[in-house]
Structures are given as structure tokens and as C-alpha cells.
Amino acid sequence: MASTLDSASLNLKVGFEIHQQLATKNKLFCNCRCKEAKEYDSSFVRKLRPTQSELGAYDPAAMFEFSKMRTVEYQAAFGSSCLVEADEEPPHDVTKEALETALIFSLALHSKVMHEIHVMRKIVIDGSNTSGFQRTMLVASGGHLDVAGKRIGVQSICLEEDAAKLISDEKGVRKFGLDRLGVPLVEIALEPVT
């Protein structure tokens, strides 16, 4: 029995997040090149664990990932990863080219650029980030995008680091390539539309 859903009768609104990798020379928090590795030179193993928030609570999604008790193996290639990606060295200053590109996106979308841009951390312990969190910055808010005669509002524009590349996920071991980890990307959150 086939049925159709009518978005108007459901009062359905849908918002989109657009993620775009930036074609910068270097990664977001180090001087490594943004290039895909053909082969990997070294590897290391980690088990990521959740930590309490400032309020003393554990993130439910982090607890769910932790319950899987997976081992994570990271593959690294010289030139496209360093101690920053391995979480063995503090991140460097934000790459100027990536920040300037995010500001250009913001101005093109008529968004209000923040007076100060701070690096925040989002908990991620599925193995796709060696540190257990993703670094992200709110660059601008508001604005709009005109598409096919319709104006779509922009909620926020963030500059963040991309996740490591999943190579395999077998028998309780996830393997990731660090060549993609830290590549800058812009995240544009659009307002819901009917």
C-alpha cells in the first residue's frame, strides 16, 4: 500500500547544512599540506574514552560510541600529517588562508561576521578525530542565499577541521587515514524552509 506524504499537511520544515572543503595550501591548525595520501608511512593505535562536560555530565552520543569498545588505528603519511593530527602537539594558529576564505563566504552570503572568533570543541569519539573532539569556529551568523527566486536564510557559518578518512571498520577495529584530518572546511547552516 503506497502512500504519499504532503509536507504542508505535516507542517514539515527542512534545514540543510552545507559542508565544503576549502582548497587551501595547508591544513587548518598546522603547516601540513592538504593532499590525499597514496600510501601511509606509519600507524598508531588509540582507544578513545568520553570525558565529563563542564557540568559534570557525559554526552549520550559519546557514551554510545564508547560502549562499542572499539580500537582505533590511525594511518599517517609524511607531508600530509604531523604531531598535531596525532594529538601529540598543540594546534598551531589558525591558517590565515582558511580564515580569509571563510570570511569571503560570510560576506558573499550577507552574514554578520563575529567581532571575535573563538575555537570551540565538539565531542567526537567515533574515532574520526584523534583528540576526541572536532575544533570549530563560529565565523558569522545571519544572512541569506537566493536560489531560484526564493530567499533562504543563513543561520550560521563555521570554519572547522574535517574528520579523518575511514579506511576500514572490521572486527572491532576502525582504521582511519590522517591525511584528511584537519583539512579546513566551511559549514553553512541554512534556515528551515517549507
Q: Model regions: which residues?
A:
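Basic, nucleic-acid-interacting segments
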Residues: 2-194
